[in-house]
Amino acid sequence: MKLLIDADFIVYKSCAAAETEVDFGSDVILVTSNFSDALSATRRELTKIRDQFGSFTPLILFFSDTVNFRKKILPEYKGHRNRKKPCGYKRVINQLKTEFEVIIMPELEADDAMGVYATQHPGNCIVSPDKDMKQIPGKLYNLDEQFTVSKESGAAWHLIQTLAGDQTDGYGGVPGVGVKRAETIFKEKGCSWKTVLETFKEKGLTEEDALVNARLARILTADDYDFNKKQPKLWSPSSDYKVNDGSGSKVKAVGTKNK
């Protein structure tokens, strides 16, 4: 088993912590960074994760590409996240490339690259605190607990996120519908694309609105990626797509906790 690690946030956090402001007075404030501190902090975080599984467990580090395919779907996607990367960010990644296997896939965020790899090579464990990764079937360690996500619960979580949206990423879902409300809707009406469309239309939104939100919410799997063209295949559900018939407990997409 390999650990598939969302390394974006680890390196970002480590580099940000290594920054120092130097105030020269007047209008001059300079930001400096200690590369050794940033790299050491990153290594410590990776060691801490590895120690949860055994010191010889192989790691693969995933980073986001500088181009994001979701911006072609919605130009405003993550538009408010305009803060530059902290000092040393690229240099730390370049150093990590000499120490670990690093994967950056064209146009994909780290989440998507992990989703594609995990479903192409089952039996590994994704390591990420991001709730989006509950879409991907298989083992997931969220830095607190380890879960096994079923294919059905992952598919349900995708539709739940389609309705609930993600304001931090810049797509709104259905106004007034959060995760809990989405779970209730699917429990009552069945977890299906038909239910998604009905819920969007009840708020005066369109099928196109629903599809845009679903495509933004979806974490890619191997089925969603064209390996020859090296680009994602946008999710296009059939009109009768469904996860379950509304029997109840299957709707809540959390997964089974591993002992």
PLM segments and residue spans:
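Intrinsic structural disorder
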Residues: 1, 21, 178, 258-259
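Domain-level signal for Mg2+-assisted phosphodiester chemistry and nucleotide/NA-binding surfaces
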Residues: 1-94
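Extended two-metal-dependent nuclease catalytic cores across DNA- and RNA-processing enzymes
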Residues: 28-30, 55-56, 79-258
